[in-house]
From Swiss-Prot:
The keyword Protein biosynthesis applies. PANTHER family: PEPTIDE DEFORMYLASE. Belongs to the polypeptide deformylase family. The gene is def. This is Peptide deformylase. It catalyses: N-terminal N-formyl-L-methionyl-[peptide] + H2O = N-terminal L-methionyl-[peptide] + formate. Its EC number is 3.5.1.88. InterPro entries: Peptide_deformylase, Peptide_deformylase_sf. One of its GO terms (molecular function) is peptide deformylase activity.
């Protein structure tokens, strides 16, 4: 099932996601829906908060990219970055911040401890685009967006686009969720 993507103003994207205690039928269904939603939106990574679920879960598939055709799709549960190496500045975008790109500096390689789709613990080193996509999606699980990592002067340059997204003045080829945030006692949805 294709799920709507939350936009950057949605509260769930600014919260620390909760760890999963296992994989049951509901989580399996969510994983399948996340892959379907990511593919429908022409994305290469998607975190559970981006579809409204505050869970430490992400999926990615970079096999559509040149030089990464042999990289298998991944399910990453409860990730924890153990170590990082190097630095790399690269332009990023995000399904939750449609139409906006910006330069973000990240480590060029990471050692990651996580659980896979079968909830088996894995520890692996990742580099290049795979490391970047993993870090971008893991940020979502901590309530951080790529725009939060941009230099302030660069962020000011995209403020109009961010305002348009907040107002719903955007067109995308995938479903978007209504953004909701808390204000005092009630929810405000835009």
């Amino acid at each position: 099932m294709i799920l709507p993507i939350t936009t950057y103003t949605d509260e769930v994207l600014h919260q620390t996601a909760k760890p999963l205690k296992g994989v049951d039928g509901a989580v399996e269904e969510l994983i399948d829906s996340m892959f379907e939603s990511m593919e429908n939106a022409s994305g290469i990574g998607l975190a559970a908060p981006q579809v409204g679920h505050s869970l430490r879960l992400l999926v990615l598939d970079i096999s559509c990219m040149k030089s990464y055709e042999d990289v298998a799709p991944m399910v990453v549960i409860n990730p924890h970055i153990l170590s990082v190496k190097g630095k790399n500045l690269m332009e990023e975008g995000c399904l939750s911040v449609p139409g906006v790109q910006g330069d973000v500096q990240r480590p060029s390689s990471i050692t990651l401890k996580y659980r896979d789709r079968n909830f088996l613990e894995q520890t692996e080193e990742f580099s290049g685009m795979l490391a970047r996509v993993l870090q971008h999606e893991i940020d979502h699980l901590s309530g951080t967006l790529f725009i939060d990592r941009m230099e302030k002067r660069d962020r000011r340059k995209i403020q109009k686009e961010l305002d348009d997204i907040a107002k719903g003045n955007i067109e995308v080829d995938y479903p978007l969720a209504r953004a909701c945030s808390r204000d005092g006692g009630g929810a405000i949805c835009m």
